[in-house]
Amino acid sequence: MQSIYINLDDSGKLSKKEIISVYGGLVFLSKKEKDKFITQYRSIVNDIKCKYCKNKDLCNKKCPEIKNTNIKNSDKRRIMNYIKKYFIVGLVISNQNVYNHIIENKAAKGRFLDYSLRRMIKEVINNQITNNKIDSKEPLKVIINIDEQTTKSNGYYNLHDGLVEELKYGISNFNYSCTYNPIVFNDLDVKVTYQDSGKSYLVQAADLVSGTIRRLILNALEEKQDINNILNNFVNYKIILPWKKAT
């Protein structure tokens, strides 16, 4: 069976106090590709992580997690140079363009983030179909790995069921008189797992990706540079929401 692994983490929060919130990560099209990434990524991390241990003389082998916010730029570059060999995806939410009633209501915020993730995941899969990496008429297994801490803070509505419905059956939105067509026309198996980033190299890598995307955008905004051009040099596939400013 065809497989696609989509591994995601967030950077920034959906809040009017922040300009953007980001989801970023890596996509693999086979277990072999995923396992190969983990093996080499783990090797790089093992080579640098002892630098960040505060009590080397009392080492208990429980090294600190390597995160976007706690490593030196030289080590981050080394890791990112490896990550960039794979397919990088990004979802950017322009917080200022999101309706206030969504941001101010926890349930509404959770539903919006759930919608945004479903939109991103569907478009990533559709991109792979368009580029003949996935056959829409053959059985497909979709594995989504997300940082569990992200889930606790955002409270997703129902990511699994929403993905199955949208990918296999399509969705009709009667409020806006529009229909989203299905893109998978055979058996579909969707698995969503929420992982401890301290134990998941996939989520750790996604943390570095999302943090890098957010930093690139904030720097571009400050320097008045074109965001799309900046992102295109790093991300293989991106989606920016909402498209229009809220009124």
Per-segment meaning from a language model:
Residues 1-247:
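Phosphate-ester processing/binding pockets and catalytic centers
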